[in-house]
Amino acid sequence: MWSILSIKRSTSRMELMCLNAAECPINVFPEQQRNMPTESLNPGTVLIVGGGPVGLITATTLAKYGVRSVILERNLTTTKWPKMDLTNSRSMEIYQRLGIADALRNVAVPSHYPFTCLFSSGLHADKAITAWDLPSPDEYRRRIREQNDGSMPSEPWLRVSQEIFEAWLKELGMENPLIDFRAGWKVKGARELDHGVEVEAIHSDTGEVWKVSADFVIGCDGAHSAIRKSLEIPLDGGPIHGYAVLVHFKSRDLSRIQKQGQFWHLFFPNAASDGGSIKGAVIAQDEVDTWTVHRFMRPDVDHTQLSSEEIVYDLLGGMGGQPFPIRIDEVLVRSTWTPSVALARSYAGPKHRIFIAGDACHQTVPTGGYGMNTGIADGYDIGWKLAAVIQGWAGPATLLSYEKERRPVGELALQWSKVHMGNLMKMSAELGLDAHMIELNNETGAELRGAMHSYLQTHDGHNQSIGVEMGYRYVSNICVPGALDAELSPPEFHPRKYTPCTMPGYRAPHVYLTTGTPVSRLFGDGFTLVAFPEGEGLNASTEQLREAARKKALPLEVVELPGEMHAHEVWGASLVLVRPDGFVSWHGDSVRSQEEADRIIAQASGFDSEHLGNHVQAQERSAL
């Protein structure tokens, strides 16, 4: 049975926007389905379709702001597939904001292990040909503290398999009284109405069909999203030529697997004569006994004729084709997957009652680790924005900003995942890698190995593209330009760099203060006004912005940092208005009047009618 949740409804502008879903028209689904059991979620409760990591992070974000959610998840258990194995620094910053980062590190790969990536011609050789020596989280954190110039994230990255992460995150969700997780319910479709959404769901065991009404729905239901299909949103892009076999297994035969050294990823190129490209990779999931092999196959190869053990041995043998056997204690799972690069043309329904996030709106190849991490940022973004609207301290433009801000980021992730994959895939043919010559102990062999080393050290952005992860700029109606912006030019985008900048739409730079505290730890749950009171007249500006926020019932934390000259220099403005997600809404050195302060706060919170557009104004009129 469906549980009925209750929530206190704020007396706010949301009473004009989020009408009881029970008021929505009933006859949405076909005639024969009109008599199906129906549940109307209480006003302010968000329905999330898909209980994987993106759906759970979305629910966790909503819960942080006191907003209830119901998750419909078709699977009865969490994933057994390793999938994601890198949590990048931007995701860790999000988890820190949600209060779960430290607990996640406790279940992840211990933080002293480096992220070494080896490139090998095969384990028959004594040594790998080259390596990307990427730092451990401990080393990364040390570098962040030492550098302290605003160009680094506030949190180092993390190694954790999705198999572990999803189970851990689901347990947190099940313990949260504001999250109602319902397993075994497959959503068949959704209808977006003027004042809500109707969703049809079927139980996987009983076949029972229910209709659920909610004010808002977020589709986190993967690449084959029923929610996206219900909205008839097309995908641009699709599968890439070829496929891969995944073998996830247990083995303590470390002396053979790690013959060429400890690694996080171990890559094997194909010989140029064997079609070039990458033969596959091994991922060390826990530095104990859990490994994942990805073996890329030509479309004409039938993998079912090979055992899982044969696939592993063949990959470890490298480009020479001679298998390298190891002791496999247990094969956990095996599957095939096809690389896909695709982007949804829209992230929301036309009435902005339905939104999609994660793989439902973007699919990337694994290179760079952008897929899951981009989805996590999607869920966090729509989570805080929807919570703010439901609670009345943000207006309609806030919901419009989700697609405007997040879709370009999805496009950026797709672009660079293809660049990284392309660099790996074309290496063998470009260098003319030869399985016999590459291991020769002579000048020819040394030259070929040297060429491969040089190529890979030049094309090493695979996991070092911090600009792609957090150096982008949001451009939307809730980013407020000011007088200071006329004097400045935005930093040039570079995939390998994050240039600190507090122009509207950029992530607020991380800096340690003189107390040793990261400035981001002082941010409130709502908006934060960071003030560097070094000059005269700043108190008046601060009070005007505080008063403007009070009039809009906008939660605003004012953080005054006198004497923090270094942080002030990095941030480049005396006043910076920071959103709940750590991105900048507005910056300036002063506010000239209360009227200007009111305008800044109104636009930043999505209430400024001049920046809504005719579509949203029409929606508001219909809601009235």
Swiss-Prot record:
Entry-linked SUPFAM superfamilies: FAD/NAD(P)-binding domain
According to its UniProt record, the EC number is: 1.-.-.-
Q: Which residues bind FAD?
A: 73, 359
Recorded metabolic or biological pathway in which this protein acts: Secondary metabolite biosynthesis
Coiled-coil intervals: none
Q: Which cofactor does it need?
A: FAD
Enzyme class, spelled out: oxidoreductase
Which InterPro entries does the UniProt record give? FAD-bd, FAD/NAD-bd_sf, RIFMO-like
What is the similarity comment for this entry? Belongs to the paxM FAD-dependent monooxygenase family.
Name listed for the protein in its UniProt record: FAD-dependent monooxygenase apdD
Q: Which organism is it from?
A: Emericella nidulans (strain FGSC A4 / ATCC 38163 / CBS 112.46 / NRRL 194 / M139) (Aspergillus nidulans)
**Taxonomic lineage from the root:** Eukaryota, Fungi, Dikarya, Ascomycota, Pezizomycotina
